Amino acid sequence: MKLEHPDRLMNRTPLSLAALETHDAFAERHIGPDAASQQAMLDTLGFATRAALIDAVIPASIRRAETLPLGPFAQPKSEAEALAALRALADKNQVFRSYIGQGYYDTHTPAVILRNVLENPAWYTAYTPYQPEISQGRLEALLNFQQMVADLTGLEISNASLLDEATAAAEAMTLLQRVGKPQSNVFYVADDVLPQTLEVIKTRAKPIGIEVKSGPAADAAAANAFGVLLQYPGANGDVRDYRALADAIHAAGGHVVVAADILALTVLMPPGEWGADVAVGNTQRFGVPMGFGGPHAAYMAVRDEFKRQMPGRLVGVTVDAQGKPALRLALQTREQHIRREKATSNVCTAQALLAIMASMYAVYHGPRGLKTIALRVNRIAALLAAGIRHLGYATVNDTFFDTLTIDTGARTAQLHAFAQAKRINLRRAGDTRVGVSVDETTTRADLADLLTIFAQAAGATAPDIDALDAGLLPAPALPPSLERTSAYLTHHVFNRHHSETEMLRYLRSLSDKDLALDRSMIPLGSCTMKLNATSEMLPVTWPEFGRIHPFAPAEQTVGYREMIDQLEQMLVAATGYAAVSLQPNAGSQGEYAGLLIIHAYHESRGESHRDVCLIPASAHGTNPASAHMAGMKVVVVACDAQGNVDIADLKAKADAHSHDLAAIMITYPSTHGVFEQNVREICEIVHAHGGQVYVDGANMNAMVGLTAPGQFGGDVSHLNLHKTFCIPHGGGGPGVGPVAVGPHLAKFLPNQRSTGYARGEDGIGAVSAAPYGSASILPISWMYIAMMGAKNLTAATETAILNANYIAKRLAPHYPVLYSGPGGLVAHECILDLRPIKDSSGITVDDVAKRLMDYGFHAPTMSFPVPGTLMVEPTESESQEELDRFIAAMIAIRDEIRAVEEGRADREDNPLRHAPHTAAVVTANEWPHAYSREQAAFPVASLVANKYWPPVGRADNAYGDRNLFCSCVPVSDYA
């Protein structure tokens, strides 16, 4: 049956109420092509129906027999209904004033940043800035972040964010293992480090043979450790002078990592000035809501000598083709997509959007504003200390920035009860102690409430705050020897945009430089740049989700946990597995967790020797990097001429490693963009040799509702909620990477002993700092699934496959499609082979990518999985009109290449070799090129009405790496 156009439905009378209700309205807005467009594309492909196309694309042996079993979410909800249902869950959360601390603090998000960054699709729909010429705005914002972190830590260079403080500390541990003394495998963690950080470090250390020791900081120098982690200030609030200790650790051949509070560093001596080699921490309190644990941007800063060992993205300054300053991602050869198992880390997605928010918080407040906030926080803490001492309590710590640990003896339970009555959370620091951490939002009235609570428990009257304030010496809580004297945030960007008008215009000027989904499609293969609907995004900023502390009592987080449980069951239904954990806060972390689960399973069976991981040659670089981190040995399996796993080679490798085979990691559909026909056989071969099957969920957008890894032989998968389930990419994060497992692996899912979170009773430990990872963005995926329902989720998958095949069919006469399945069909993406073009014209895949910018498009994925190719993934959200615009651009570029091939255009002086063309170049007095200005800037007529101008010419990558500079540049450089 052919799809019916809605106009024909409207011509029928009478229409019932059921026909007029708009439960499917969201799906019609999420899926780009309407019924008529879909039919036109199907006609182009030679299929009468979408179902017929899907039958031809997906092997019958792996098709789902049943509709997605979504239970109460099987039927779609309208946007209003879904928001109301989620609001009902949010209202079950109780927003208390949380003074728990432990790395998480309430904060004020400046409204100008909330509206113009967090809620602005120009920022949140962008991709990781691998194409620097169309990413200058967010690259500048991330460079500001790096400058901010380097200044505040007193170290030479910072990266552009990591996932959370705990994983940043674990990354620092492995960094120091690579550069540290080879005779030691000990990493020493001071006993006042945040407990969640210690847990993640232990999880990360075990598979790679690092021994973690924990004890008093004073004993660190004698531990013969290659690295030592110190907390500054400590978890109990102490501000300690570690200068002599750092010297002793260095004298013993070790290195020092400091986990430092970013706000405290505005008033405390920075770690880089007293001996730290690496500093890590969380920037959450710079304007990013707690969000039940995330997402937040962690940071890492290092001494210059370690810059090439840093994990994650690093923004650097270079020049463009005209010699003007330009920004780009630097030192990319460190990263997993290039170095695979030899990479510094498996981190791919980081926390770009949150790093941008934190950097803009610093830009908006400036150094004076930040210091004022810090001094106010410290003053409130000092007044609280004075008040409770006046009431007869003793503080465990005499020095502090914002945190007090108080001896409360037998009054402890009563104190917590009085606090709960005032809707206040205090930290439970044992049976006889209470912790209090104040923050930017703490007011005089809040201080009065806190003093009243302690007074009630003491049977006394709370002291007068003004009297306390008048009698308190200036800054008595900070050791004078550790007060900061060095300047920070001296660059003009942190000293100019302090009025809202200036800030608004600065943010607009940056976003205007970038190309995101709000301008055009982003056809990046394996990245799934689909719609991030506004209704999905709205709940992220609700205080009932944003102002919840991750360690709040369970009775205050009922709504959160119900929503999370529901989302886990939705994902169980989509994957065909038995259980899901949402703790991993990136795809790389979910992948890593999955491999640890496999190892734990083998260990439980007395087969801990199984450590070989088979990985196809076509796999994404994250796979071997994760396997290496999980302590596995990577053995590469060849692919055949069609891009499929070579079954003969797989059998040979499985036979050779039968005794020690742990797992195979496969991506499905494959990274070559096809549904391999023999995926069941692959799984059976590995299972026959005692291994487990890890199915990478990067391409889940081609499977939802049609097939499921848990049903065709997979044992474990990670998903990318920032791909398939609509969490935006944010310019390089946030993301969520749930790990889904079969029933035999469920008990090994991540847990967190310090908070009592036990998803699996024999869990692998914590892989993220918070029990539920990046919990505050989970409502996005919940909303998407609730509004789509089972039928429309399947329709979205089918449309993604339709769109990809339409592009492949239309472009095949111009660019060979490198891999396809039976009937010449692809899955949800296709690979265009540009290698013959380079041979015939000298034009490279890079030239084509840059030329697409002149046409107003982000390039497809370049040279992955095959060098010299473009991988195109349109997703289901793009309309036929937008697909046709992209197709027209690619055909026009092919005509420009043909002109070079035929000698009608010079091999060096042509629009592709000089792309992209900036407005300054096109309007300059001199035009030295053989082609016209019009061809350079307006190669197709549609650009006249809507032209995006790249702000810089082609970035010089080699120059940037040779002359590495990763801080803000002087204004004069832009003159």
Curated annotation (Swiss-Prot):
State a single Gene Ontology molecular function: glycine binding
List of residues that carry N6-(pyridoxal phosphate)lysine:
723
Whom does it interact with, and what assembly results? Answer: The glycine cleavage system is composed of four proteins: P, T, L and H.
What NCBIfam families does this protein's entry cite? gcvP, PRK04366.1
Top-rank taxon of the source lineage equals Bacteria
CDD domains annotated for this entry? GDC-P
- Pfam family of this protein, just one? GcvP2_C
Its lineage opens with:
Bacteria, Pseudomonadati, Pseudomonadota, Betaproteobacteria, Burkholderiales
Q: Which SUPFAM superfamilies match?
A: PLP-dependent transferases (SSF53383)
Please give the name of this protein.
Glycine dehydrogenase (decarboxylating)
Q: Which GO terms describe its cellular component?
A: cytosol; glycine cleavage complex
Gene3D superfamilies in the cross-refs: Aspartate Aminotransferase, domain 1 (3.90.1150.10), Type I PLP-dependent aspartate aminotransferase-like (Major domain) (3.40.640.10)
